[in-house]
């Protein structure tokens, strides 16, 4: 299994926690990490990590034509979005014998083996996962039907054609703006099922559970396995976490009116946050701002969130 991700020094703890979770599954894998600054490359190199191959940002920008030009006309987050397909392309260029490459967001955590997902994908040239929005989060469909958290490309004609299209689209336009057919690097995926016949939409609900779909499921624990609707959790996408101080984190589950208790609290969020916290030291998570709130929403939504957070008590204190 060949996975890839990319991040800078601010997300090193995320990347290390992702790596640890993959190691815990005991699968045979390589995690290809594109280091988005020199500090990250030097830091990770000193750790001599197993199952990891590191790439420098300079090499990425030298190998992918148009990347440096794109860097000049978008902000840092938008540039990182642009580098999602570029990272995949660069790895396949440097490792032509790889059968497939799977892009992962760095804030994922595996609770069981990803083999079950690859068993479902089989010989598909492309594999993507839906957000599976709950009705409360359905309005977020404007950001895309599919989530970039997991994207697989087989190193065949159709897989490379899809990857090349994604790269071309992102180099041309990749901004934090919601438009009819595009948003960042993500909404481009919506057109892929119609364009690529050998594309697989992953059915396993244990893949990419997250705050936007968490209310769809009944969470339980059986034989130390975390289940959602009796299906084993493969990986959880820990988006929207906010570090309050060195030991306290806001899960922001109140945004979707989800109580933080039971299996979800003790076996999902606490497990992840303890591991993440161990990799942080004195650093803090940089919380992404709400870039898309305007007008009355910009005033009312923060008030709503404070009230719902008070009611649902979605803060985890790791000292307790």
Regions found by a protein language model. Give the residues of each.
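GT-A fold catalytic core of metal-dependent nucleotide-sugar glycosyltransferases
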Residues: 81-133, 152-153
């Amino acid at each position: 299994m060949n996975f890839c991700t990319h991040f800078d020094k601010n997300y090193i703890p995320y990347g290390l926690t992702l790596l640890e979770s993959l190691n815990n599954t005991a699968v045979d894998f390589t995690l290809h990490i594109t280091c988005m600054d020199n500090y990250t490359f030097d830091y990770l190199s000193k750790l001599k990590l197993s199952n990891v191959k590191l790439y420098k940002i300079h090499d990425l920008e030298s190998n992918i034509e148009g990347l440096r030009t794109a860097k000049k006309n978008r902000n840092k987050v938008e540039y990182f979005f642009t580098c999602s397909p570029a990272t995949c392309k660069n790895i396949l260029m440097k490792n032509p014998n790889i059968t497939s490459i799977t892009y992962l967001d760095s804030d994922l955590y595996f609770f069981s083996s990803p083999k079950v997902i690859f068993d479902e994908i089989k010989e598909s040239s492309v594999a993507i996962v839906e957000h599976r929005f709950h009705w409360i989060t359905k309005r977020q469909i404007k950001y895309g039907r599919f989530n970039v958290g997991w994207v697989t490309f087989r190193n065949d004609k159709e897989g490379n054609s899809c990857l090349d299209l994604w790269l071309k689209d992102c180099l041309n336009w990749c901004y934090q703006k919601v438009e009819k057919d595009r948003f960042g690097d993500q909404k481009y995926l919506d057109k892929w099922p119609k364009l690529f016949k050998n594309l697989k939409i992953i059915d396993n609900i244990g893949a990419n559970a997250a705050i936007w779909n968490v209310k769809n499921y009944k969470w339980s624990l059986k034989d130390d396995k975390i289940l959602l609707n009796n299906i084993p959790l493969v990986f959880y996408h820990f988006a929207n976490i906010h570090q309050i101080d060195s030991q306290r984190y806001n899960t922001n589950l109140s945004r979707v009116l989800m109580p933080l208790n039971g299996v979800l609290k003790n076996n999902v969020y606490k497990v992840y946050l303890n591991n993440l916290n161990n990799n942080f030291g004195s650093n803090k998570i940089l919380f992404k701002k709400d870039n898309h709130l305007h007008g009355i929403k910009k005033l009312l939504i923060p008030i709503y969130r404070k009230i719902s957070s008070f009611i649902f008590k979605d803060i985890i204190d790791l000292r307790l």
